[in-house]
């Protein structure tokens, strides 16, 4: 991968959080949490709307991270990419009707030799997602591993 792109921040990507998308996500993850699955219950709650589960971050961040995957200058070998790790710092709750704006920054590219003597590259990215009021909803750190080839 192209080391010169460390520090690059990609354009902001906006995501409109729809109630149906939250319902779909909740069904896919087998959630029974009424804040995420029951419109009437959630509307009467102190949130006033259907609430996205914390892991919904993958939905709105994925669109922003596509810029990284599609960046030809980065020269990422996408078929060799596997998930390394991720960490999150959550802020405001994400609700249906919110507009989430996410930026992605490449914070590091590290080369490490694996046990087979092949060179893996670790791509470390950070995301920052704000709601329509400019409030932080999530900061993420994502590590992807490009497995070394022969």
Functional labels for PLM-detected ranges:
Residues 1-85:
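Hot-dog-fold acyl-thioester-processing enzymes
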